[in-house]
Amino acid sequence: MKTTTRQTGRYGAFTPVPLPGRTWPNNIIGSAPRWLSTDLRDGNQSLATPMSPDRKLAMFELLVSMGYKEIEVGFPVASQDDFDFLRVLIEQERIPEDVRISVLVQARDELIRRTVESLEGAPRATIHLYNATSPLFRRVVFGMSRNECKDLAVQGTRLMMKYAEKTLGDCDLGFQYSPELFSDTELDFSLEVCEAVMDVWQPEPGRGIILNFPTTVERSLPNVFADQIEWLSRNLSRREHVCLSIHPHNDRGTAVASAELALLAGAERIEGCLFGNGERAGNVCLVTLGLNMFTHGVDPGIDFSDINEIRRTVERCNGLAVHPRHPYGGDLVYTSFSGSHQDAIKKGFDALEREAAHRGAAVGDLPWEMPYLPLDPEDVGRTYEAVVRINSQSGKGGVAYVMSAWHGLNLPRDLQIDFAHVVQSQADAEGGEITPDRVKRLFEREYLSSSDLPVPLASGTELVTTSLHIDGERFDVGADRADTVQAVRATLTRWGFDVRAVHRTGIAGQDRGPDADVAVYAECRVEGRVSWGVGIDRDIEAASLAAVRSAVIRARLKRLPARGGEATGIVAPLVAAGR
């Protein structure tokens, strides 16, 4: 059987670019490039079932709403559907005044003529002309010499200008040329062809040209592509009239890196697709590129504030699901299952809230510094609810976060540890994820259902009574409301428990009214062993009694000694509604 190792001799390393004094490694990305979305052309042509007219229109409207100003709307001579869609956009005046459409065409006479006709009546448009220039395609696909290949590009440019002059006189017409398979083409030949094309177009102020350099098939390391782009930027004539554009593909999985390094090297425009759709492994992902800039403090000029709606529309139009791990947009990219990650995230949120309170500011106005989360999910329309999800790998931090964020219960640290063991045991037994609602039910079963009876309090405002059931015996306690916990302490002391109640009352939860619930956490220590109980009630005394009794009874149910211990009640406010 052949092995992959034995086949490596069939492949060779990509030849590096000799570039003394390269400057791009010392540069930074300080502003956004020009963006072009090719979802409706390169993305659409890669689909097993191309978009219907309705889906194309939905994609176009999404791109416009996000702020893309250059949109490649199709390949009009490739299909009647593409031609008809372009006509709908023009004839129904669906192209906003600040948006420029683009169409692709090969450097062939009849194709160029038909493409120009498809644009009749368009207010603004760019014709994107291309021909393959790599040695492999010249030799194997077209049987052309270098001069013949260059002449094809030159003649295509002349034909485009001739037909456009006759048909598109009122159109604000732009011109783009791409040496297809640029990254596989000799650099000197790419430059030669581009210079010949510019000699025909004659770029000047107000009449620039887009020279677009695609990694039609990604073969090299990103730094090699950056060297190619810097070499071109150095050597192109009329550079001030050239918009140096790139079109990275993702065959090696490094399209984003290639694009970012190319920006450092002088690229000024990027073509790509939302969520990386496109031929084979896809085009560069415009979402990833834009939000990478956003997280470095650079405004991408694109609205990603509702990433879920963007994703839903793209999935519906493409008929392809976005991977749950796709950067910024996948279902799981803001989620942690690991216990150590969850603990760090919880501490990060706690620190942000403390800092916000200290400054008297909203959390959303503070610099984002959060373990494991490079982007605030709320900045792209996500919530914090899915940041922490619970399974057998989760620890106290994750459990505590879910109880606080979902259910408004801020558990004392030792109770976090105690309950985490309960949740982890359940996750091990069941397998899979434990939902927040399931976590709450486990909490209620474990800590709120340990008493035989609810804690009864007399209806009077001064005198209260309650009952304790310990080891099968009932003990009634009556006292002034202010002395209820002390009375319980005295009763339990007679049975060998030293009860100490510590009330911690802080800021009320979301419900700050007089009827807001409070949560009381009681820690019962019996001969050095610990049992926890919880009480939740609008009446703080009722909650305290329920918590202490729950803790004592849980100790008994665990077969702990019934005497010779102590119980401690800790009272804290409920942080969020939801009993």
Curated annotation (Swiss-Prot):
Signal peptide: none annotated. Pfam families: HMGL-like, IPMS_D2. Pathway: Amino-acid biosynthesis; L-leucine biosynthesis; L-leucine from 3-methyl-2-oxobutanoate: step 1/4. It catalyses: 3-methyl-2-oxobutanoate + acetyl-CoA + H2O = (2S)-2-isopropylmalate + CoA + H(+). Residues 450-579 are annotated as: Regulatory domain. InterPro entries: 2-isopropylmalate_synth_dimer, AIPM/Hcit_synth_CS, Aldolase_TIM, IPM_Synthase, LeuA-like_post-cat, LeuA_allosteric_dom_sf, LeuA_N_DRE-TIM, PYR_CT. Its cofactor is Mg(2+). Its main location: cytoplasm. Keywords: Amino-acid biosynthesis, Branched-chain amino acid biosynthesis, Cytoplasm, Leucine biosynthesis, Magnesium, Metal-binding, Transferase. GO terms for biological process: L-leucine biosynthetic process. One of its GO terms (molecular function) is magnesium ion binding. It is found in: Cytoplasm. It comes from the Bacteria. The gene is leuA. The keyword Cytoplasm applies. Homodimer. One of its GO terms (cellular component) is cytoplasm. Catalyzes the condensation of the acetyl group of acetyl-CoA with 3-methyl-2-oxobutanoate (2-ketoisovalerate) to form 3-carboxy-3-hydroxy-4-methylpentanoate (2-isopropylmalate). Belongs to the alpha-IPM synthase/homocitrate synthase family. LeuA type 2 subfamily. It comes from Streptosporangium roseum (strain ATCC 12428 / DSM 43021 / JCM 3005 / KCTC 9067 / NCIMB 10171 / NRRL 2505 / NI 9100). It is an enzyme of class 2 (transferase). Its EC number is 2.3.3.13. Gene3D superfamilies: 3.30.160.270, Aldolase class I. Residues 33-308 form the Pyruvate carboxyltransferase domain. This is 2-isopropylmalate synthase. Mg(2+) binds at D42, H247, H249, N283. PROSITE patterns: AIPM_HOMOCIT_SYNTH_1 (PS00815), AIPM_HOMOCIT_SYNTH_2 (PS00816), PYR_CT (PS50991).
